[in-house]
């Protein structure tokens, strides 16, 4: 019995000693948090792609060309940032004295329009309320959800400027009588007019018969230089840090495509074409097609993390069904085109934030002038070839414009150190809602 009692006493003493040791360890435990991500500190340390909020709405939501017509003799110029600013400045912060909405069942006619007017030509349609409020800072009660893609500026009507916003289908327009004095606008126009060259107006279908609905393009384009654009690559880690709310990211890679995801979103990165595609899982129910919300929303979202890269990105297309907006890189006032989408930012808005975000991770490092001038065919040659091509329905041609083709990895003078593209001036045609390069009578 004595041995048993002795053993019990030893065991009890050991248990008491272990309890004391464990209690001391618990009270003095200090966790190692060196390798634990703190979401709040991570967000505060997240760096933007470039300096945020440097892009301006009035240089991002712009026309692609400016047309002047006097007595049915058109002339025009590309919509450089400088030209657009000069012509919109007299219109900004003015009042709208009257608004009138007119609907035409057949071809559009504007009987009150004078024979001397200027036209802003857009490649996309957008809400009139957005353009007036966000770009011109005009307060006007206009028809709900009225979209337009041409703005006619009548500077020969009485003493004040009259605006006509024309719908994309060419059957509606909204007339706005402003407090802008004609003389103020004409002073600015006189400077822009120096850059204008002869343009030709083309009728492609029954909706482009009126003088404000023609397809306009330069009659005989001037020789344009070719360029080489050298790029830097934006790191995927920087994009992930901006878009993902927490640090838990699972990576998987297959066939050159790497997938990153957590409980808030999923992103795919293709290292062959440097394309990045992010989808917000908290906004996956439905996208928003309300352009009054999506245009300012997507602009602020991209601008907020420096996503426009301090380059000339402009809104280029809007999809009223899916809600997707495409911002496109411009060079010297001309749009650039690339089959891989290396020149685009595509974004769709949800109920509260970004729903879908696709972009190239290429940032322009330097643009080199090749000193080579390229001649383009005359517009009449382009028009005639398209009209006589049996594979093309000429009635579906809605725009003809000059742009720069970004040709990846050209055979000559290839710079091996950095990704680069050669930019070559070409004719482009908007056909059935899509843009194609014109090549010897064909659309490619």
Give the location of each predicted region:
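Short, Lys/Arg-rich N-terminal segment immediately upstream of the first membrane anchor
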Residues: 1-7
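Hydrophobic membrane-insertion alpha-helices, especially the h-region
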Residues: 8-26
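Short, non-transmembrane alpha-helical segments in secretory-pathway proteins
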Residues: 83, 95, 283-322, 369-415
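Extended, non-globular interaction scaffolds
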Residues: 423, 441-444
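Exposed beta-strand-loop-beta-strand "reactive/processing" segments of non-cytosolic proteins
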Residues: 237-276, 308-354, 358-360, 402-435
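Non-catalytic terminal regions of proteins
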Residues: 70-75, 349-351, 395
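Short helix-loop boundary/capping segments
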Residues: 352-377
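Preferential activation on post-signal-peptide N-terminal prodomains/segments
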Residues: 24-290
């Amino acid at each position: 019995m004595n041995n048993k009692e002795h053993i019990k006493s030893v065991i009890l003493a050991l248990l008491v000693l272990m309890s004391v040791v464990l209690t001391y360890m618990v009270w003095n435990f200090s966790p190692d948090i060196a390798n634990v991500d703190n979401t709040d500190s991570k967000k505060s340390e997240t760096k933007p792609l470039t300096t945020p909020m440097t892009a301006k709405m009035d240089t991002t939501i712009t026309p692609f060309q400016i047309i002047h017509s006097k007595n049915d003799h058109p002339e025009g110029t590309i919509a450089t940032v400088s030209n657009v600013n000069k012509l919109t400045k007299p219109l900004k912060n003015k009042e709208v004295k009257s608004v009138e909405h007119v609907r035409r069942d057949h071809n559009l006619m504007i009987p009150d329009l004078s024979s001397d007017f200027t036209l802003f030509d857009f490649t996309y349609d957008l809400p009139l309320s957005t353009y007036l409020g966000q770009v011109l800072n005009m307060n006007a009660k206009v028809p709900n959800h009225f979209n337009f893609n041409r703005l006619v500026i009548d500077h020969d009507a009485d003493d004040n400027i009259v605006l006509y916003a024309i719908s994309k289908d060419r059957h509606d327009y909204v007339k706005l009588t402003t407090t802008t004095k004609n003389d103020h606008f004409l002073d600015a126009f006189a400077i822009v007019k120096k850059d204008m060259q002869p343009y030709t107006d083309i009728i492609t279908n029954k909706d482009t018969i009126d003088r404000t609905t023609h397809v306009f393009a330069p009659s005989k384009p001037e020789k344009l230089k070719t360029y080489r654009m050298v790029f830097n690559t934006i790191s995927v880690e920087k994009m992930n840090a901006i878009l993902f709310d927490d640090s838990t990211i699972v990576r998987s890679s297959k066939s050159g495509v790497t997938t990153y995801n957590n409980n808030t979103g999923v992103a795919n990165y293709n290292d062959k074409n440097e394309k990045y595609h992010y989808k917000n899982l908290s906004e996956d129910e439905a996208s928003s097609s309300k352009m009054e919300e999506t245009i300012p929303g997507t602009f602020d979202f991209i601008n907020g993390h420096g996503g426009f890269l301090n380059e000339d990105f402009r809104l280029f297309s809007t999809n009223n069904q899916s809600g997707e907006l495409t911002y496109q890189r411009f060079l010297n006032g001309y749009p650039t085109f690339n089959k891989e989408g290396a020149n685009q930012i595509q974004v769709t808005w949800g109920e509260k934030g970004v729903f879908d975000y696709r972009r190239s991770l290429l940032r322009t490092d330097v643009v080199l002038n090749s000193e080579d001038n390229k001649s383009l065919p005359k517009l009449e040659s382009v028009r005639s070839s398209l009209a006589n091509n049996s594979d093309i329905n000429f009635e579906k041609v809605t725009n003809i414009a000059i742009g720069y083709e970004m040709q990846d990895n050209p055979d000559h003078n290839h710079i091996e150190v950095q990704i680069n593209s050669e930019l070559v001036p070409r004719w482009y045609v908007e056909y059935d809602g899509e843009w194609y390069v014109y090549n010897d009578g064909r659309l490619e």
